[in-house]
Amino acid sequence: LDKYPIKMKTDFNHCESLYWVFTQLCNDQCDHCYNLSGPKGARISEEECMAIIENMPDRVDRLILSGGEPLADRKLLYAILDRLRDRYAERTQIMLQTNGDLLTEPILATLIEKGVSRFDIASIDRYHKHAGARLEVLAELFEAHGVRGDHKDPLIDKDSYLIENELSWGYWGATEDMWLGGNWARGMALEKGIWKRDPQHNFCTILSGARNFLGGYDDIPQEISIQLWRINPCCPGTKFPIGDARTERVADVLERVSRHPVFKKLNEGDPWRMGEHLGISEAEARKRTEVLQNVCLYCDAFFEENMQDLNRERFIELPVLQ
């Protein structure tokens, strides 16, 4: 866990990688989906999305738009791309994560015109409807528009998380050999019982986990996640979000939690030590995880028992007394 440690960053108005699920609407409904996306998936308004963009850090190296299926909410996607271009111009690389089912020649041309420079086809697995059946068609489509396929793998390393001066695409899916190592205990995967049962597997210490969400490591990019409006230190999300991107500046939220002992440990990718300041030893945490069979489920239990101050649903607005 101490591999490549450096001093934690202090400029939270700069984010190397921001992963934003702006919609959970999807044309598919996969058994492994971690956020319950589908034809009736949750959505937020264009007004809320514009507020979220306004509250993003002033500097973002790359911004990954995902879902759901972004192309299933195309009008909103286009509005988001236009606003992102107004705010960041060419200073930010815009990347789109899609299952590729709805991608056509006119849509691809529009996406490129609106500033998308990286396309990730994240559906090459047994869970998706087409499971890569369109891959050859998509390859021809990308080639016709000058989108290079030299960088097929997901961009997860610090030295390759950006691709300079070219359009590119890649493809991958929820397979056992992907960098995550299995399905998070979230959403449909949790309901269907196909989440990874391995108490030793630390989702937290790899990209898409919480490690480096506040900076401090130079082997993976510093990345945060926004699930609709919920600001999270990781893609699967903590039990309670660390902030609301509709009403709070992301930089302020990160600066606030950077002083908290729980989030310092999560930033180190070490969830089993996040309760030490409360008298919960690493040995106790690991023993609890053995029972729960998954580190994300241990994290959920810890937050439920010790982090209720972040639970936005517990606040009840009381009537004003006259």
Predicted features by range, described:
Residues 210-231, 247-322:
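Auxiliary Fe-S-binding modules of radical SAM enzymes
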Residues 1-98, 102-114:
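Conserved alpha-helical substructure of the radical SAM core
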Residues 26, 30-33, 234-235, 293-299:
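Short cysteine clusters
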Residues 32, 36-39, 135, 241, ...:
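Secreted/processed peptides and extracellular or luminal domains of membrane proteins
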Residues 111, 116-127:
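Non-cysteine beta-strand/loop elements that form the S-adenosyl-L-methionine
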Residues 85, 89-99, 127-163:
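Short acidic, glycine/proline-enriched helix-loop-strand junctions
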